[in-house]
A protein has these predicted regions:
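Soluble, non-transmembrane domains of envelope/secretory-pathway proteins that act on or interact
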Residues: 2, 7-16, 50-178
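Active-site Gly/Thr loop motif
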Residues: 31-59
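Extended, non-catalytic substrate-recognition/exosite surfaces adjacent to catalytic cores, especially
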Residues: 1-36
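Glycine-rich loops and low-complexity Gly/Arg-rich segments
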Residues: 26, 36, 44-45, 103-107
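Exposed alpha-helical structural elements
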Residues: 23, 27, 40-44, 171
Length: 178
């Protein structure tokens, strides 16, 4: 923790232990980088800090009591929180409170670039506008990392159809029920 005047209040040097597969860590950080590149944090951080490839995630608790943002660069994981001591609604959401605070932090503590290197079994796959994998180069709208040991086997597969009336597609729910 660093005080407003730049004084270090608390610093920790924890020993790292692998908690998840490298592929899972990569996919999570990639998704969090998209929050800064194209999502909630793009407007506030993208133009000023885009070259650092930051990763982040906004959060808002029920009734707008708390505003959260987690920012990750090549050196630090920073969590910012804004809320009221009496747990009443602050009127802030992740992007209007804690994200702004994190941006101000970066103004005073320049980040290091977070350059991700895909581990083994992560393939860059072309995707069309409907979310289908494309391997012939026709209709590609973007590329996405995919955790697979056989990228070629995914060619031509159709994206699962969304089931009506569900909060999440059935195939997604099934992944977590196993």
């Amino acid at each position: 923790m660093i005080a407003e005047d730049g004084t270090v209040i608390y610093q920790s040097f924890p020993q790292a232990q692998r908690a998840v597969a490298p592929q899972a860590a990569y996919m999570t950080l990639y998704g969090m980088q998209q929050v800064v590149e194209r999502g909630t944090a793009a407007r506030r951080l993208g133009s000023k800090f885009g070259k650092y490839h930051l990763a982040g995630k906004t959060g808002t608790t029920n009734l707008m009591r708390d505003s959260w943002f987690v920012g990750i660069d090549g050196k630090e994981v920073t969590v910012s929180w804004m809320g009221l001591d009496d747990n009443s609604p602050s009127g802030l959401y992740g992007g209007s409170g804690a994200l702004v605070l994190y941006g101000r932090y970066l103004d005073n503590q320049p980040p290091l670039a977070l350059n991700l290197t895909p581990p083994e079994d992560i393939a860059e796959m072309a995707v069309d506008a409907d979310g289908n994998f494309v391997c012939n180069g026709v209709g590609v709208t973007r590329t996405l990392p995919v955790w697979t040991t056989d990228a070629q086997a995914l060619c031509g597969q159709q994206a699962p159809a969304q089931q009506q009336g569900e909060e999440a597609p059935g195939w997604l729910k099934e992944m977590f029920e196993q």
